[in-house]
UniProtKB/Swiss-Prot annotation:
It is found in: Cytoplasm. The lineage of its organism: Bacteria, Pseudomonadati, Thermodesulfobacteriota, Desulfobulbia, Desulfobulbales. One of its GO terms (biological process) is regulation of translational termination. It comes from the Bacteria. Residues 10-280 form the tr-type G domain. Increases the formation of ribosomal termination complexes and stimulates activities of RF-1 and RF-2. It binds guanine nucleotides and has strong preference for UGA stop codons. It may interact directly with the ribosome. The stimulation of RF-1 and RF-2 is significantly reduced by GTP and GDP, but not by GMP. This is Peptide chain release factor 3. CDD domains: RF3 (cd04169), RF3_II (cd03689), RF3_III (cd16259).
């Protein structure tokens, strides 16, 4: 491994932020970008007084609704480290996209609303992180409002998420009595001034809790802080770095993202603790980031990031080696060499051409319909990275076109949106319908809005009586052909041509599975 490759890997941190909707994820993202100097003013998320839109929510429907429905990738520098931040969809209907994003990160920050504790979406996302043993740092947000007691929040996290909490900061009061946080990690007291947004995170050094300065600064709350910290010393588990890396323990920080309070302390700890890019599993072997040969995979495709150019960008995670502009790589699914001439790096809606990039970096590759989610590019050795699946949809709708002359545009729009993985599209073997499938119902609304805005297609959708879908396969081609011939009314092909069984109920699905025991019915389809 070259010295430069080693240094570049060591200074990279690639992470995602996960939370339930409205826990403050987008606000935290803005503040992190502010510290990184990537933006001059935090995006004033959901503020009516300030018309500026949140930097990471760039799609029209996101700006309208105030939720993140796609994933933004943002790069910034902090303390001589290169940070790649993946802002995941916060709405529960977009778990597929979030799952794929979590395949591209090395660690995550989990945001918890102090008034609500662990919520449903957080539990789902943690399941995904647990599957991959993704290290998690927890930020307990909104301490400037009334909420649960910090010990109760940690008990809630440990109980529902099965991960041990190791507090590295501790709040002093909450709501109207919120005075600040004591950083256990740095032995510093940070005082909170309501209505201000300080990005000076120095704080007051207090190494000895018996220091009279503590009483001077906090008054009666100094006694409470001493009692809390004494209780913690006996009850809370001290941080074990190996347990954090193996995702069995989470360092916990408290703060208020909207007031930019407690954010820098967490960011500093993140830089010190979060892992640099690590090994990745391919079908044939484990790939180390330090290998000289370039490799990586596509985890997301986004259409029309720039409506003026009708472009499609493939989001690509570099797993090993160095990327240089114009380099030739092998596109394994298609079995041909391509040149990566116009790769970009992201700062939400702002993009810049990239001359070189390293393991952990996320680059955008212009895609004219030939790149799919899960594709691997590499030099020399044919590699196929694993674990980037499609999920069987749980909700279905039939598409009805208002103007039949727009059929061509509808086909193009649905195929492109299906390539992004935001929606799945099926054509029944019998009939000319387009059937959309999704993990969550909001995806249908988003798809219709995007068809109208980006493809000038006016369409509506109506319920259809399917309740489950399974991809079908069989090693015995003859048996599969017989199955297809005898069950045409229940079969469709997805946008990539894979045979799919559509069932009207779980009972019907089980009936078919029992009737055809030699046919495999798959809940997920690995992107091949």
């Amino acid at each position: 491994m070259s010295k430069q490759l080693e240094q570049e890997i060591a200074k990279r941190r690639t992470f995602g932020i996960i939370s339930h909707p409205d826990a403050g994820k987008t606000t935290l993202t803005e503040k992190l970008l502010l510290f990184g100097g990537a933006i001059n003013m935090a995006g004033a998320v959901k503020s009516r007084k300030i018309e500026r839109k949140a930097t990471s929510d760039w799609m029209a429907i996101e700006q309208e609704r105030g939720i993140s429905v796609t994933t933004s990738v943002m790069k910034f520098t902090y303390r001589e480290h290169e940070i790649n931040l993946l802002d995941t969809p916060g709405h529960q209907d977009f778990s597929e996209d979030t799952y794929r994003v979590l395949t591209a990160v090395d660690s995550a920050i989990m945001v918890i609303d102090s008034a609500k504790g662990v919520e449903a979406q957080t539990e789902k996302l943690m399941e995904v992180c647990r599957m991959r043993n993704t290290p998690i740092i927890t930020f307990i947000n909104k301490l400037d409002r009334e909420g649960m007691h910090p010990l109760d929040i940690m008990a809630d996290i440990e109980d529902k998420l099965q991960i041990e909490c190791a507090p590295l900061s501790w709040p002093i009061g909450m709501g109207k009595d919120f005075k600040g946080v004591y950083n256990i990690y740095q032995k510093r007291l940070h005082l909170f001034t309501p209505g201000t947004e300080s990005i000076d995170g120095q704080g007051q050094m207090i190494e000895d809790l018996d220091d009279p300065l503590l009483d001077e600064l906090l008054g009666r709350q100094a006694v409470e802080l001493r009692e809390d910290l004494e209780l913690l010393a006996g009850a809370a588990t001290p941080l074990e770095y190996d347990q954090y890396l193996s995702a069995t323990q989470s360092p916990v920080f408290f703060g208020s993202a909207v007031n930019n309070f407690g954010v820098q302390e967490m960011l500093d700890a993140f830089i010190d603790m979060a892992p640099a890019p690590g090994p990745r599993m391919a079908v044939s072997r484990e790939v180390l980031p330090s290998e000289e040969n370039f490799s990586g995979f596509v985890f997301k495709i986004q259409a029309n990031m720039d409506p003026a150019h009708r472009d499609r960008i493939a989001f690509f995670r570099i797993c090993s080696g160095k990327f240089t502009r114009g380099m030739k790589v092998h596109h394994h699914r298609l079995g041909k060499d391509i040149s990566l001439a116009n790769a970009t790096i992201f700062m939400a809606q702002e993009r810049a051409n990239v001359e070189e990039a390293w393991p952990g970096d996320i680059i955008g590759i212009h895609n004219h319909g030939t790149i799919k989610i899960g594709d691997t590019f590499s030099i020399k050795e044919p590699l196929k990275f694993t674990g980037i699946p499609n999920f069987a949809p749980e909700h279905f709708r039939r598409v009805i076109l208002k103007n039949p002359l727009k059929m061509k545009q509808l086909q193009k729009g649905l195929i492109q949106l299906a390539e992004e993985g935001a929606i799945q599209v099926f054509r029944p073997i019998i009939g000319a319908d387009y059937i959309m499938g999704a993990v969550g119902v909001l995806q249908f609304e988003v798809t219709m809005a995007r068809l109208k805005n980006e493809y000038s297609v006016d369409a509506i959708y109506e319920p259809i009586s399917y309740q489950a879908a399974r991809w079908v396969s069989c090693e015995d081609k003859k048996a599969l052909a017989e199955f297809e011939k005898k069950n045409q009314s229940t079969l469709a092909r997805d946008s990539e041509g894979f045979l799919t069984h559509l069932a009207q109920s779980d009972w019907m699905l089980n009936f078919f599975m029992e009737k055809w025991p030699n046919i495999d019915f798959h809940k997920t389809r690995e992107n091949i």
